[in-house]
Amino acid sequence: MAIIKRGARNKTAQEPAKRSAKIKKATYDSGKKKEVGVSDLTLLSTISDEAINENLKKRFTNGTIYTYIGHVLISVNPFRDLGIYTDAVLESYKGKNRLEVPPHVFAIAESMYYNLKAYNENQCVIISGESGAGKTEAAKRIMQYIASASESNSESIGKIKDMVLATNPLLESFGCAKTLRNNNSSRHGKYLEIRFNNQFEPCAGNITNYLLEKQRVVSQIKEERNFHIFYQFTKGASENYRQTFGVQKPEQYIYTSAAGCTSVDTIDDVKDYEDTLKAMQVIGLSQDEQDQIFRMLSSILWVGNISFVENEEGNAQVRDTSVTDFVAYLLQIDSQVLMKALVERTMETSHGMRRGSVYHVPLNIVQATAVRDALAKAIYNNMFDWIVERVNISLQAYPGADKSIGILDIYGFEIFEHNSFEQICINYVNEKLQQIFIQLTLKSEQETYEREQIQWTPIKFFDNKIVCDLIESRRPPGIFAAMNDSVATAHADSDAADQAFSQRLNLFSTNPHFALRSNKFVIKHYAGDVTYDVNGITDKNKDQLQRDLVELIATSSNAFLRTIFPDNVDKDSKRRPPTAGDKIIKSANELVETLSKAQPSYIRTIKPNQTKSPNDYDDQQVLHQVKYLGLKENVRIRRAGFAYRQVFDKFVERFYLLSPSCSYAGDYTWQGETLEAVKLILKEASIPEKEYQVGVSQVFIKTPETLFALEHMRDKYWYNMAARIQRAWRRFLQRRIDSATRIQRAIREKKGGNKYEKLRDEGSKILAARKERRTMSLLGFRAFMGDYLLCNERKSRGAYIKKQAGISDKVVFSIKGEQLQSKFGRSSVRVKKVLILTHSHLYIIGQSMVQNSVQYTTEYKIDVNKIAGVSMTNLQDDWVAINLSNSTQPDPLLHTFFKTELVTQLKKLNGRIQVKIGTVIEYQKKPGKMHKVKSQVSEATPKYNDNYKSGTILVRRGHPANSPQKKKPKKGKGHSKHHSTSTSAPRSSVQSSQPSAPVSRKTKKPAPPPPGSKKLSSSVAQTASRPQPVANSARGAAQPQATPQPAQVTQPQQKKVAPPPPPPPPMQSSEPKYEAAYDFPGSGSPSELPLKKGEVVYITREEPSGWSLAKTLDGSREGWVPTNYVVKHQGGSVPPPPPAPAAVQATQAANVTSTPVSSSQSETATTATPASVAAAQPNFSDGLASALAARANKMRVESDGEDNGNDDDDDDDW
């Protein structure tokens, strides 16, 4: 199946939205033109002819001439250049559907070209409207767009496109003229087919010509002109032509000056003549062919200057024989033979099957003038037909045409003061086009809905078939048939034929669309009533050249003249030659048949005034056109109907890619009925049922937006498939790289050990068995990773802090901690800080709330080379003082869980640093003033933390100072085989226990938790998501955390085991109870706990920022609440908490790092309630992260409790 790629969309100047953004930021487009009225008449609130007219008037006044009725384009002639056909405008419509851009003729052309490629169906555009409404201009713009859109590097293709465009100036020159209503009125009809090859490049073309108005060659209405070419030639002819063909100015010729208009302000005849010559060259007309064309034009002009006078017998004779002599020279015939053919008529009698006598009948002046004009009309008409055929020969030079786009540019509906045979032919063709529009857009559409059993409310409309039958019908005879009968009855006498035709018109008196007047008749066309003159109408219908003129031309030595005239008519043939009426009926029906084989587009043109003024808008005239074009009915049917319909097979063939059930890898895989495939496609493409209906054999899409959505999804299918293949390949390559990395790491560790573990061992050496050790420090999983806040990553909290602090160097160590700060009139307090160490400086960064957001600023910037030493106690506390040398700043006293790693990193950067370990910490509280902080063993302190009180650090007894580091445990059996590995940050050999880079990784979906665990785990996630009041954390590594709750552990699917028995009910919490003083609905954040006034909760932690961590009495919900919204509960009956939920396996206990646990650990795990988990001694094999989380939360609860009751200021020396 061919892949159809729609043209690229134009990119805007703004940056693409982030992937996480749902809606792009709105921006003001100052260049966009303000919308006036509605761009689609189906959006009108009131559907009436007056409302349509008013909307068109608003847009015309604003310089907006295009409006839609669904897919039908309404065009109002602006009578001025609006600058809307430039190359830039044309480019903006490429690859766009009509809803993405304003209404324009380019949008219709783009739709046709896209449908040709997408559906491989012939396309055509029917441009209709009255004379002067802008049909020819619309046809030219469609050709301009298609030539530009069908880009090709082929020289032959480019030549065809140039030829197609060149047909415009050539056929305009020979087929258009200035009329009272239009300065460039088409006086013929043409249907141009642009044919395309399999690559949808224009490779051929064909033009069909319809009924040239040859009467204009010899006579025009006052202030009108002959065909443009006569004025171009007489004004712009070269000196060679003037000498050879005797070319004069247009004022010297009767055929160009009789109407009194030889120049038009808006027409440059000389320039247009040059364009015509260029077009002839592009199409391929040789110089000899061009010379012969201009010879014929000269002969026509000079034939018009032949005049007659009466001789003595009252017959006509040529006034000036020099004129006939020059005409004979141009036509290359004998002068005497020419004069005789003009003033005499040859008659031949017959007797049965035998020929009779031949008579030469002299003509009077009127008859001789008619013969002269007939000769001029015949030469021009036959030459025009030859030019069209010659163009077709050039356009057919390149074979391979498969599909086509047809452009119909035909004369518009005409109503003059005197209307004759030409007008009835023109108006008849317009009736046929109106009938096509009715058949395809109104009648056929409603019949299709009824046949397909689609829900539909019928709409009444006028079917003009009765008018078409009145003109073209043979049985019963129509007007053309009656005309032919009259000619056959009295073929020798035109007046008698007119009289016979007038009598036959009585046959139509009962037709409601016909009325008879004296010597005239009225046909009620769809565009209005037109009165036609009977006099002379039958003679124009004969369309036969007098026998004498045919024989005259046959004597010419000019090969071109003989070529453009057909062979002599067989005199013995008894068959009646076809009349002009027969030809126009045949041409019209062939046109209808051609159009019915293509998918039509419609352009309805409207003429706003009769004065050709760019500022006038004649409401009555436009309202009349709105009514006879049937725009109101079109709007009503469009609003009630469906924008697209297609038979099941073609719809499935087009869109089966959108359904995974019907396709795989681009192949059609559905084995069932096509009807079921249609329903699956629409369902799996998420098309609402109200947007389509499924009939008996077709599917109907209601709105064009839905169709465009389907087309867009289909266009994106191939790109999505390519992206999937690319993702799979990249995933494979990354897995291979990660595997190689793991192998390399394992080899390096085998040879030289892990660098992070080496750094840890070096830290143990620095302590030199002088400081008691914590349990967590001795774990085998412990490794000195350094950048725990991930400051070196691109998108992380640490990177944000680093940017705000103005740090540009690479970070070697980062952690959240606390600093002891003295407050005037208060005890020294522990203030949260961020510690960042680079190769040259140690940064102590503070944080503050500014407009509800955390801001980070550098408070201390310490040069590493100016650090003289560090001071620590010999107990297991986490305090360390940074002793500065010759500094005007006080020495900072810091608290951090990773104090040994900080000291090790400082010692590595500056080997001169002295590490002081004793019973006290000595530091400069003020510059030049030493202060000592004592340490004391207290078993009443929190198990995983220490307390600072009145210059003394209270801490439990730790492991002996000479305790050895435990060996790193082996990986568990349940470790994921294909876990993701990030190479962007350093990792230890056991990645599951250490903080890692913030790289999004997809892991296997964990096993579903037992009942009751979901609520508990969600509360932890909610609490951890709020940035302001959450305790210090480094992605869950060795930092204070909220009270741990059972949570899901991201681990491989393991074998199900029988659940343990439920635990006993939880003990009554000893935490203080508070009561909500006000309603707190919350802001919608999952980290907040909404409260109702009077609701009692536990407060587990208070923050200086004004937030408190609360949880409900039953422990099912936990979150942050404003501290000033709750007050101490004064007692009273509080309902007991409900029974504890079902037991949760220990492997699903709180684990903020989602550490995988080995299968052996999982099998020996025990159950625990949230309270018991917090208090339980962590098992070494449970991993560092779980133990750190439990330690941090327990420490925070106990530390806060003691600090709240401490009001003494023993440490204040201010």
UniProtKB/Swiss-Prot annotation:
Which residues does this entry mark as bearing Phosphoserine?
Answer: S357
Which modifications occur after translation, per UniProt?
Phosphorylation of the TEDS site (Ser-357) is required for the polarization of the actin cytoskeleton. Phosphorylation probably activates the myosin-I ATPase activity.
GO cellular-component terms in the record? actin cortical patch; cell cortex of cell tip; mating projection tip; medial cortex; myosin I complex; plasma membrane raft; prospore membrane
Q: What is its main location?
A: cytoplasm
| Positions contributing to ATP binding | G129, E130, S131, G132, A133, G134, K135, T136
Q: Where is the composition biased (Basic residues)?
A: 965-980
Cell compartment(s), UniProt? Cytoplasm, Cytoskeleton, Actin patch
Q: Which parts of the sequence belong to the IQ domain?
A: 719-739, 740-765
Asked whether the UniProt record includes rRNA processing among its keywords, one would answer no
Region ranges (Actin-binding): 404-486
**Which cysteines are disulphide-bonded?**
none
Question: What are the Myosin motor domain coordinates in residue numbering?
Answer: 36-715
- Pfam families recorded: Myosin_head (PF00063), Myosin_TH1 (PF06017), SH3_1 (PF00018)
What are the recorded GO MF terms, alphabetically?
Answer: actin filament binding; Arp2/3 complex binding; ATP binding; hydrolase activity; microfilament motor activity
Q: Sorted alphabetically, which keywords does the UniProt record give?
A: Actin-binding, ATP-binding, Cytoplasm, Cytoskeleton, Hydrolase, Motor protein, Myosin, Nucleotide-binding, Phosphoprotein, Repeat, SH3 domain
Residue stretches of biased makeup (Low complexity) = 981-1000, 1037-1057, 1157-1177
Where in the numbering of this chain does the TH1 domain appear? 771-961
Which InterPro entries did the record assign? Fungal_myosin-I_SH3 (IPR035535), Kinesin_motor_dom_sf (IPR036961), Myosin_head_motor_dom-like (IPR001609), Myosin_TH1 (IPR010926), MYSc_Myo1 (IPR036072), P-loop_NTPase (IPR027417), SH3-like_dom_sf (IPR036028), SH3_domain (IPR001452)
Residue spans of biased composition, Acidic residues class:
1200-1214
SH3 domain location is: 1069-1131
Q: Where is the composition biased (Pro residues)?
A: 1058-1067
Q: What is known of its domains?
A: The myosin motor domain displays actin-stimulated ATPase activity and generates a mechanochemical force. The tail domain participates in molecular interactions that specify the role of the motor domain. It is composed of several tail homology (TH) domains, namely a putative phospholipid-binding myosin tail domain (also named TH1), an Ala- and Pro-rich domain (TH2), followed by an SH3 domain and a C-terminal acidic domain (TH3).
Describe the family membership recorded for this protein in Swiss-Prot or TrEMBL.
Belongs to the TRAFAC class myosin-kinesin ATPase superfamily. Myosin family.
Q: What is this protein called?
A: Myosin-1
